[in-house]
Amino acid sequence: MKIKDFLQENKISVGDNAIFLLEKLGIKDENLIKFLEREIGESAKMSKSKANVVDPEEAVEKYGADTVRLYILFAAPPEQDFEWTDEGIQGAYRFLQRYWNFVNKHLEKIKNLTYTVEELRNVQGKAKEVRREIHQTIADYRRDFEERYQFNTAIAKIMKLLNTLQDFSPQTEQDYKVLREGIETITLLLSPITPHIAEEVWEMLGNEGFIINQPIPEPDPEALKVEEIEIPVQVNGKLRARVKVPADADEETVKNIVLSDERVQKWVQGKEVKKFIYVKGKLVNVVVK
C-alpha cells in the first residue's frame, strides 16, 4: 500500500504528521508551522486522534472564557467544522477590548441617563439613523440566533452595530440617550455569548439586577420604518444618478422628483421621454429619444 493511500484510509494527513513530529521534537514555532502548512498545501485539523487539540483551559487562561466563547460561536456556523487559529481568537479578544474601551469612553456621559421608547421615537437626523440600525440589529439577531441558529451572523451584526456607534458623534442629550440605548442593546445581545463582560458593563451602566434575568430586547417597529429611500436612476439603461424619494411615494411623485434632478436633466434635456419605468422602491429607468 502506498503511503498516501495509507494516510487517507486512516484519515491522517501529511500536515497532521508534520505538526505531530514538531510537537514531539519540542518545536512550537508558529511561523514554521504556518510555512509547512503553506508548502504542503493543507492545514492540520484539530482531533484527539491526531494529538493536535487546543487545550481550552490554556486558551481561557490566556484570553478569558468570554473570548473563547465568542470565537467558537463566531468562527463558523454550528454545523460546520472550523480551524482554530491564533489570529481568530486574537480578533475576538480585540473586539471585546474595543467594546469595553468604548463603553468606558462614554460612561460618564451616559451612566445617569434614562429614556423611554416613546421619547426616542422623536429623535431626528443622524440619531434617527443610528436608532434604526440599533433596532434592525435586534431584529436580525433574533432571527439568526433564535430561529436559524446562525450564531456567527448574529455576532457579525453586533460587531457592525458597534462600528456604527463608534462613528456616531453625539452632541445633544438626546443623542447620548440613543448612544446609551445602542450600548445597552449590544450588552444585552452579547449576554448569552459573553456573559461575564456583559454583566460587568450592565452594572457599570447603573442598571439594577443581573443581566442574565433580562429578556432579549424586541425591535421597535416605529424605529424600523424608512421614511426616505435612495433609488438608482437609469437613462436608456445606463446608471446616471441615485435619487432620494419618500419611501411611500407613488410613481407620479417619483417621476417629478427624478426628472427635476440636475444629474438626470443633463441626460434628458431636449429629448422626448418615451417611457418612465418605476419599479417601486428599487429602480427607475427613463427611456428617451
Swiss-Prot record:
One GO-annotated biological process of the protein: leucyl-tRNA aminoacylation
Record motif 'KMSKS' region, residues: 45-49
Residues given in the record as ATP binding sites: K48
Nucleotide-binding found in the keyword field: yes
Compartments, record wording: Cytoplasm
Any single GO CC term annotated in Swiss-Prot or TrEMBL for this entry: cytoplasm
Family annotation (InterPro entries): aa-tRNA-synth_Ia, Leu-tRNA-ligase, M/V/L/I-tRNA-synth_anticd-bd, tRNAsynth_Ia_anticodon-bd
Highest taxon, organism lineage: Bacteria
Pfam short name (any one): tRNA-synt_1
Family membership: Belongs to the class-I aminoacyl-tRNA synthetase family.
Name this polypeptide is given: Leucine--tRNA ligase subunit beta
Organism ancestry: Bacteria, Pseudomonadati, Aquificota, Aquificia, Aquificales
